[in-house]
C-alpha cells in the first residue's frame, strides 16, 4: 500500500494537469532509451515544451546506446558508431551547443580486399585515385556520385521542414514529403537495381559499392536503395568524430536537459484515460524491484522487433492493440584487437611495406567486413598512428564473433581482444511495410525511421520529428502534421 501512494499522487497530479485545458503543457514525459535518439528527443521535447516539463529517461544499460567506447591499454576507443558525415546538421548543432570539439583527424589510406588481392587501393594523390577509378570502372563512380547527391539534396529538405515546425506521423509520409514516390519506391527496390538503371556497372557494384555497404550495414547491394544511398553518402563526404568520445553527445544532452535518468528496464506501457485525455502508465523493474509511473507523453527510443531478446516491452489497454514491429536486426560484432597485423595475409610479407589503415572487404572473405587501425578518442598534438610493424589497436567488424583461428589469420600475435556485440541496423528486406512514429495519441516510436535508413544522424532527425509531432498533437496544431507540397508552403512562409 505504501508503494501505491506515490503512484496515486502522481496520477492525481496528471489528472489535474489534464483538466487544466489544452493550453497547459504536459506535466511529465517518459523516454525509453538513452541512446542518441532518446537523449536527442529529450532535448528537443524540452526545447518545445519548456523547462518546467519533467522528463524521465529510462535506460537499462549505459547512456549512449550504440555510441560507446572500450578501454584498451589505458586508452579509450570507439566501439560503436565511429564517425559522422559532414552534413549531419543535428549532430553538428549538438556539438556546438555542448561546447564539444571535433577530434583531430589522423589521415590513413584505404583499400578494398577481395580475399586474394586488393580490388582497389587508395593513394596519397587525389588525381591518381580518380584516374584509377576511371581506368577500372569507367564513369561509374561519377554516375554513383550524381545519384547519391540527388538523393541527399532532397533529404536535406527535412532540416528546413523541421525548422518551420512540420512533423510526420509515419515514415512513409516523411519520405514522400522529401522525394515523393521516388523515395518511397527506393525502400522497395535494391541498391543494385537502382544503380544499374542509372548506368553504374555491375563490376563497380560488386567491387566498390558492396564493400561500402558491408562496412556500414554489414549487408549487400540487395538492400533497399534508400538506405544504401544514405550509406554511400557517408563514404563520399568528409567524416568527423567527437573529441573524448561520441557518447559525450548523449550524456551532454541529458545533462543540459536536466532529465531524470532512471536506470531500469521498462516492461510495459498501459493506456489509461479520463475525460478523453490519454494517460500512460510505464511499468519498470530494476535492482530495487518493480514500480511504475504515469505520463502524458511516452516516446519509445529503442528498437521494437520480435527477435530482440533484450526487449520484452509490452503494450496493454490499447484498442485496437499495438502490433509487434515485424522484422529482424543485423547483428554486428566489433572486436578491438591490440596486436600485430599479419600483413602476409594481405600480400605484404614485409609489414613495414603495408600502406593501409582501413581495409574494406567484398563478399569474400566472409568472416570480417572491415579492419581499421584506429586512434583513441583523445588525440594529443604529438599523436601519430602506429606503423604496421608495431603493435596497434585494430577494430575488426564482423557478422559473428571471431574464432581464434580467424584472429590468427588476421594477426601474427596479439595482447588482448575485447568485443562489443550490437543489434546495429535493421536487416533490410525482413519487414514488408514501413512503421509509424505515432503508435497512439501521445505514444511514439522514434526508431521507426531506421527501417528506412539507419545512422546516428537519422536517429537525430527522427528525434526532432517525434518532438515536433508530440508538440503539434498536444496543442492540436494539425496544420503542421503530414502536410503535402511542403516545399511550396515553406517558400511561402519565407
UniProtKB/Swiss-Prot annotation:
Q: What organism does the UniProt record list as the source?
A: Homo sapiens
Leader sequence range is 1-22
Q: Which residues are glycosylated?
A: 342
Q: Which GO terms describe its molecular function?
A: prenylcysteine oxidase activity
The portions of this protein that span the membrane are none
Compartment(s): Secreted
Q: What is its EC number?
A: 1.8.3.-
Entry protein name: Prenylcysteine oxidase 1-like
